[in-house]
Every structure is written in structure tokens, then in C-alpha cells.
């Protein structure tokens, strides 16, 4: 059974057809500009199916979700196609990818917001139930970069980041960031998919407001990450 057949069995023909339309848009645009290295079955497996399964244990209908550096829309757009009632916002700094996401939004008649800019310049005071990112940066950098995007009240924002087989080493390197940024790790969840790859979700919240010096400017975060 290929990935499309598996998706059809799990989510129905209508949803599978919309995901197929999304994949075709990616493939067409990838011929013009390099949007993603995923193609063929890898696009379906790692781009589409894995994205859905990573978010599925956490995000429910009507939850608000912020996806940082989504690129062509992974992991949030495939999940939105399956769960159209999710309130999605995407931050993407690459203008070509933003234009592609706008085309996806129009052609598939999806409802989501796109912010074209860097995450540190996103200063809208909006509560998000969940914040996610995939393949954007090491965990200690992600933690600082996104510290001001999450809320404590009226309920804590859940940070859920997609990581690979080296998730434990990233988590160990982030221990000082966890202390300084007053975070609490809730869960390390292994995502089981039908192909041979280890995917883990690191789930945490922030427990208190932190010093105004955080997050630092991007160049300082990169040059001297919290360790």
C-alpha cells in the first residue's frame, strides 16, 4: 500500500484528493524554483503523512496553531487540509515560499494567515494554543527564538517541535536554556509512521515570564546560543 492509498483509507477520498492537489502544486512549483528537496514517495511520506501524524496527537479542531518557518507548508498545511477548523498562522521569511503558500491558500480554498518576515519581528499579541516548527534550528535556539510567542495566561501555549533521531542530544544541549527561559518539558513523544524513520515531538510550556533581554537579536543567538 502506497502513502496515498493509506491516507485515503484513513481520511477519506475527498481529503486525499485535496492533499494530492497540494502535492501537485509543490511539484509544479519545484520545477521553477527550489522549494523543497522532497519529491516522489518521499514527498508523500515525509512531507504529507509525517506532518499529519506529528501534529495529530496534540492539536484538535478549533485550536490555534503557529507554524514557524513552514517553507512549503510542513507540517501545518497537510494537517490543516485534514483538519480545516484549525486556526493556522504561518511565519515564513522567504518571499518565494510566501507567494507559493498564498497560491496554495487560494487554489485549495484554505483559511490561514501568513506573516512574511522573521520570527523575532512577529510582535502581534495573539494567544496560540500550539507553536510548532520543523527542521528550523536546534532546540536551544528554537527555545530562545520563540520565547515571547507563547502565553502563560489564560492558559499556557504548548510548544511542539519536530525532531529526528538526535532529539536526546538536542534536549541535553538545551538544559541550560530550559532553566534560563523558565520552561517545563512535558513529553517526548515518538511518532510511529509506516516507513523506517525515527521522529519525535518535544512538548514543553513556559512557566513564567523571563528577562527582557530574551530573545536576543538573531545574530547574537546564532553566534552564542544558550548552552
UniProtKB/Swiss-Prot annotation:
Which residues are noted in the entry as S-adenosyl-L-methionine-binding? 69, 74, 119-120, 134
Q: What class of enzyme is it?
A: transferase
Arranged from A to Z, the UniProt key words for this protein are:
Cytoplasm, Methyltransferase, rRNA processing, S-adenosyl-L-methionine, Transferase
Q: Where in the cell is it found?
A: Cytoplasm
Q: SUPFAM superfamilies from the entry?
A: S-adenosyl-L-methionine-dependent methyltransferases (SSF53335)
Q: State its Enzyme Commission number(s).
A: 2.1.1.-
Record's function text: Specifically methylates the N7 position of a guanine in 16S rRNA.
Annotated protein name in UniProt: Ribosomal RNA small subunit methyltransferase G
What organism does the record attribute this protein to?
Mycoplasmopsis pulmonis (strain UAB CTIP)
Amino acid at each position: 500500500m502506497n502513502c496515498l492509498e493509506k491516507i485515503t483509507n484513513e481520511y477519506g477520498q475527498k481529503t486525499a484528493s485535496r492533499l494530492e492537489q497540494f502535492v501537485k502544486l509543490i511539484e509544479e512549483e519545484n520545477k521553477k524554483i527550489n522549494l523543497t528537496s522532497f519529491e516522489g514517495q518521499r514527498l508523500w511520506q515525509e512531507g504529507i503523512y509525517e506532518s499529519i501524524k506529528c501534529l495529530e496527537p496534540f492539536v484538535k479542531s478549533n485550536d490555534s496553531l503557529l507554524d514557524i518557518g513552514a517553507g512549503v507548508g510542513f507540517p501545518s498545511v497537510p494537517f490543516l487540509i485534514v483538519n480545516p477548523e484549525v486556526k493556522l498562522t504561518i511565519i515564513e521569511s522567504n518571499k518565494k515560499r510566501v507567494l507559493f503558500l498564498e497560491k496554495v491558500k487560494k487554489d485549495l480554498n484554505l483559511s490561514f494567515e501568513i506573516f512574511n518576515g522573521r520570527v523575532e519581528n512577529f510582535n502581534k499579541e495573539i494567544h496560540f494554543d500550539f507553536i510548532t516548527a520543523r527542521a528550523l534550528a536546534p532546540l536551544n535556539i528554537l527555545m530562545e527564538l520563540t520565547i515571547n510567542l507563547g502565553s502563560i495566561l489564560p492558559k499556557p501555549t504548548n510548544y511542539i517541535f519536530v525532531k529526528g533521531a538526535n532529539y536526546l542530544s538536542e534536549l541535553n544541549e538545551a538544559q541550560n536554556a530550559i532553566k534560563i527561559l523558565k520552561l517545563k518539558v512535558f513529553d517526548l513523544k515518538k511518532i510511529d509512521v509506516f516507513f523506517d524513520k525515527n521522529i519525535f515531538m518535544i512538548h514543553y510550556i513556559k512557566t513564567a515570564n523571563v528577562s527582557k533581554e530574551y530573545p536576543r537579536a538573531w545574530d547574537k543567538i546564532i553566534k552564542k546560543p544558550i548552552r
